[in-house]
């Protein structure tokens, strides 16, 4: 049993602007099973969904062992660019409900554990007593 305490950081995402969204990218060239690749190819997010993901997500200062213990990982991501508070960030959203922003000097990690995020991911947050199958792409 692990309890994660995070400092609460308030963000107002009214001034976020999505500049670029790349197609989903499958990151497991050695996995010859077409199932995961097909799921990844079907996964699409638009600008309003990306804004919603970040507005619902919790922010983490580092990718700690504790954070990685709470979320799964899937070999699929959607990357792009955004501006927040007049600062340009590269973002990467993993299909298993985690994300990160980087400006080359600083990296911010995100995890979306709220049910409102589930339909936007292939593998939603597993901490509510299920693993997989809750996203919009059913196994």
Feature-to-residue mapping (PLM):
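Bacterial N-terminal signal peptides
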Residues: 1-8
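Boundary at the C-terminal end of the N-terminal hydrophobic targeting segment
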Residues: 12-14
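Acidic/histidine-rich, surface-exposed loop or edge segments in extracytoplasmic proteins
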Residues: 24-40
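Mature extracytoplasmic domains of secretory-pathway proteins
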Residues: 38-97
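A short, sequence-level motif marking secondary-structure junctions
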Residues: 92-99, 113-118
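C-terminal partner/receptor-binding element of secreted or periplasmic proteins
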Residues: 104-139
């Amino acid at each position: 049993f692990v309890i994660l305490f995070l400092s609460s950081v308030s963000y107002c995402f009214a001034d976020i602007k999505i500049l670029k969204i790349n197609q989903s990218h499958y990151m497991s060239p050695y996995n010859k099973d077409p199932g995961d690749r097909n799921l990844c190819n079907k996964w699409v997010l638009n600008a309003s969904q990306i804004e919603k993901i970040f507005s619902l997500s919790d922010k983490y200062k580092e990718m700690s062992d504790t954070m990685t213990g709470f979320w799964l990982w899937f070999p699929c991501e959607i990357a792009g660019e955004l501006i927040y508070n007049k600062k340009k960030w590269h973002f990467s959203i993993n299909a298993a409900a985690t994300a990160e922003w980087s400006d080359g000097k600083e990296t911010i990690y995100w995890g979306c554990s709220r049910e409102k995020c589930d339909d936007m991911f292939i593998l939603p947050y597993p901490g509510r007593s299920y693993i997989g199958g809750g996203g919009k792409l059913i196994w």
